[in-house]
């Protein structure tokens, strides 16, 4: 695999997001554009110039934390270091920009995402109760 992490390719990130099977409904390009501002970081992982993963975040809370809003890796490229490479770049960038932590939100049913985050040093900070326990949202944070 010839993995390359590039910054700023929002269309590539949205293209990958639409192919992530865990995302039951995906955001259109205009939703990304309306949420993101100058604080945003858009990363796309490419293999042979084809997008295979992405990570998008921004300064949502204005409290020193960077919000890792959306991200994913195509199933055929999982367990190959793509998610770690994206997270490494995001964390280094956030530190350089002066952020003191990274926050993310996932769902209880995404066990692989929860395990990945815990392995990278994230703590569970707050559950958001839901009638369907599998749909419960879970906030996580990593101090940088």
Place the predicted regions along the sequence by residue:
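Conserved acetyl-CoA-binding loop-helix of GNAT-fold acetyltransferases
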Residues: 73, 79-92, 115, 119
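Conserved beta-strand in the GNAT
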Residues: 44, 50-59, 65-72
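Active-site rim helix/loop that mediates acceptor-substrate recognition in acyltransferases
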Residues: 22-46, 56
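A conserved beta-turn-beta hairpin within the catalytic core of GNAT-like acetyltransferases
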Residues: 59-69, 78, 132-136
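Short amphipathic alpha-helix that is part of the acyltransferase structural core
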Residues: 1-27, 138
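Short hydrophobic/aromatic beta-strand element in the GNAT-like acyltransferase core
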Residues: 40-44, 54, 70, 103, ...
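Conserved catalytic-core motifs of GNAT/GCN5-like acyltransferases
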Residues: 103-107, 118-139
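Conserved GNAT acetyl-CoA-binding A-motif
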Residues: 94-106
